Amino acid sequence: MNKLGTELANAWMKKTLVDLNGFSENEIPKNRDEAYKALNLFYEELDKKTVGWKIGAVAKEVQKEEGFDGPVPGKIFKETILPSNCSIKYSEIPYSNLECEYAFEIDQDVKIDGELLNKINNFKLYTAIDITSSRYVQSSKNKFDKLVQMYLGISDHGNGGKIIIGEEIKNWHTIDINKIKIKLKINDNVTEPY
């Protein structure tokens, strides 16, 4: 997985794409362990401070529909957090998609265990837009089945690009957060509220 991790890190830094046609079968991740090996090398090569985490495909329904075997994690770096009123150049985030998300601000070290549930109401919750991205030449990635594409996504920084943090959702634990509306302006056109 060394070649994949190194080439993905270079693609991130140089804003280029990785053509998987130049990879042998044993250089493509076939399971999560191999995907994480490439991902960890990617992070070592970049040497950037982690300020948060993104976790994609959290819902079991999404995992089943996409043919995934679990969620798709990735780190958030300081320079990838954007303010809510910003401009984005598509060339800086290739093959991107916009996804409405929530972002927790966790201002203390926590273990992911039963105690986390006791502390979760103390955390701030924000609206967010995750701008997913890919550093692969898409035609070279699309030839693989959905599960291998997921492993390639994990290796590729969890398909991470940038994230826009919106407004804090006050009293989030007492309201139906699934009914929150966002407004998004693309090329000076306001989208429909979702």
Regions found by a protein language model. Give the residues of each.
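Catalytic-core "active-site belt" of small-molecule-metabolizing enzymes
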Residues: 2-194
